[in-house]
Amino acid sequence: MKMKKLTGIVLAAACMVSLAGCGSSEKKEVNVEKPEDLKTLTIGVQQGTTGDILSSDQVEKDSQMKRYPKGSTAIQALKNGKIDCVVIDSEPAAKFGEKNQDLKIIDGVFETEEYAMCVKKGNTELLDEMNKALEELKEDGTVDKIIGNYIGDDTGKYQYESPADVDHSKVTLVMATNAEFEPYEYHEGDGIVGIDVDLSRAICDKMGYDLEILDMEFDSILPSIAAGKADFGAAGMTVDAERQKNADFTDTYANASQVVIVRK
């Protein structure tokens, strides 16, 4: 009799665990059409990015914000049901979408933003040099070709290479970036590649500098430039009023927007 009772208790406990497991695996339907719809959601972002800033303005309490060092870590948390959605830039989102067919991208929630590179506040000499080079690269079509090599129908058709007669007689410029933001900067093999990498190299070629890339956390880029550890930053960085307090920005070179990623 005691054995039967014990068996019954064990079976009942197993059923309860099973039901609890089933309950936790149920998908929560998330619909987002405007920023205000994020108010009660648990949101994953890459720390310090525009997605972090915009989402933080919408939630009821900061504990709803789950900040990760990499966008890919936020995506994994979403797939595991730890968060309701991820807010991130549109192009990296597209890359994540290609690799994760169980996710859905919702666009049109936020307004379009502009990307630029940044230099130490007050370093007008370098800023003017970079803007001049960037203008020339826009005029001769190099910027469009570099972006097209990573986004759109011409992907892989134009890989930027430094001209054979390029003069790198000036000092090396150090570029601060966060190589977790495909297609703008990401790891491939033993190197770092992407739109910002190719464009920075093209700008340095125009100015007569060699290029060194320093990979770091996204929210360390501006402090590193301010401290003189890097000369400029390029990391799919949106120009906004808060960042302009701490750095000067070049002319813009790309447009993007924040999107919301949810489970299907």
Residue ranges of predicted features:
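Beta->alpha turn/N-cap motifs
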Residues: 46-50, 70-71, 86-94, 140, ...
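Bilobed "Venus flytrap"/periplasmic-binding protein-like clamshell domains
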Residues: 27-69, 90-92, 177-183, 192-205, ...
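Acidic, polar ligand-binding/catalytic clefts
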Residues: 26-37, 100-111, 121, 201, ...
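Extended ligand-binding regions for polar small-molecule ligands
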Residues: 23-24, 49, 116-156, 198-206, ...
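Ligand-binding clefts/hinges and TM-proximal coupling segments of bilobed small-molecule sensing domains
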Residues: 53-65, 105-109, 134-170
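Periplasmic-binding protein-like
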Residues: 90, 94-131, 154, 158-162, ...
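Extracytoplasmic small-molecule ligand-binding "clamshell" domains
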Residues: 58, 64-67, 76, 85, ...
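C-terminal motif of bacterial Sec signal peptides marking the signal peptidase cleavage site
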Residues: 17-21
